């Protein structure tokens, strides 16, 4: 029997999922994206060469691994085709191994225009979206008016739906946001060009997955963003527009939850966040700058500097509960090298002095202060360590304390960006 493993982020994204998915796909027959869009940025470093993927599953760099984009992903055809071209220039036969669900909602030019117009109108109160049309595309899906990938192959039907959509969205763009209208004919012509290129890659992803399952193949489900950005469970409204938690695996792929064997939660040894929203352990001092510099904390999708702070056990405990995490992968441990003291947030204190767990909305974070434990740091390098015994004693103590605070085992430790710089204590596919 094969094993089916979910890999997802437990913080606010950027936890290092891409590297771990790439590492574990050595055993997988297929890798599946099940939510999000090209707002994700998964960075892989193989033999020193960096590749950033936004839509295509990270298993694409492993020869023979099938890559699937499930119905829960909002798909921007132009972004996907650019990504395919870049990989093909490196000799990766993407079109042979990539299959896309015809049920994926499309992201088209009017979604991008709406996304950017809204952020501009919000001014200082902006959410911090990537401006790539993700939210508006999910809105159209939920409103049951959205165009899907499968619609591309029926020109008349597509044109009729597009006309109705542009009547609606152009009214909002022109009369509410005072922005230019999107041209119908240009949008239609571009979409029909995409159709010819995408058609050979269409497949019933759910049926493909169940066929693999029946043949005893190992399957990996690759999450995007992080659990605290989940539309339902995140720091609302500073969240993304999809379910980034483990429940999204089933709805975004057609693969029922009882078939999932292991959920791997990826967490940094510290905490980062891109864009607006609450961040109790955020640092504005030299330590924050140190983490940002050593961790190269700039978004793979937007290039924006990430906010940095101490490890937060409170949000991780919440993520472990809502995802039924089987085990954790601790990434970027090496970024903490050289610090005299490391801190871990163990709770939040309100104005009355009460220690609380993680709130469920952004406003409830106002006025909360982190409660810290301090531990001695380490001066020795952890970069490239392959065994637990190679790590400094204080680094091992830090790892043990994280496990105690969050109530879940750390099964994998990442000690550098390359797939080889990893300590595997328990393999998810074992």
Curated annotation (Swiss-Prot):
Residues that hold IMP according to the record: 14-17, 39-42, 130, 144, 225, 240, 304
The organism's place on the tree of life at top rank: Bacteria
Pfam families for the chain: Adenylsucc_synt
NCBIfam families: PRK01117.1, purA
Catalytic residue positions: 14 (proton acceptor), 42 (proton donor)
UniProt xrefs under SUPFAM superfamilies: P-loop containing nucleoside triphosphate hydrolases
Residues the entry annotates as binding GTP: 13-19, 41-43, 306, 332-334, 414-416
Family of the protein in this entry: Belongs to the adenylosuccinate synthetase family.
Major subcellular site: cytoplasm
Subunit structure: Homodimer.
Subcellular location: Cytoplasm
E.C. numbers: 6.3.4.4
Pathway: Purine metabolism; AMP biosynthesis via de novo pathway; AMP from IMP: step 1/2
Principal EC category: ligase
Biological process, per Gene Ontology: 'de novo' AMP biosynthetic process; IMP metabolic process
Organism: Pseudomonas aeruginosa (strain ATCC 15692 / DSM 22644 / CIP 104116 / JCM 14847 / LMG 12228 / 1C / PRS 101 / PAO1)
Catalytic activity: IMP + L-aspartate + GTP = N(6)-(1,2-dicarboxyethyl)-AMP + GDP + phosphate + 2 H(+)
Gene Ontology molecular function, alphabetical: adenylosuccinate synthase activity; GTP binding; magnesium ion binding
Name of the protein this chain belongs to: Adenylosuccinate synthetase
Cofactor: binding details: Binds 1 Mg(2+) ion per subunit.
Residue sites binding substrate per the record: 300-306
Gene: purA
PROSITE patterns to which the protein is assigned, alphabetical: ADENYLOSUCCIN_SYN_1, ADENYLOSUCCIN_SYN_2
Keywords: Cytoplasm, GTP-binding, Ligase, Magnesium, Metal-binding, Nucleotide-binding, Purine biosynthesis
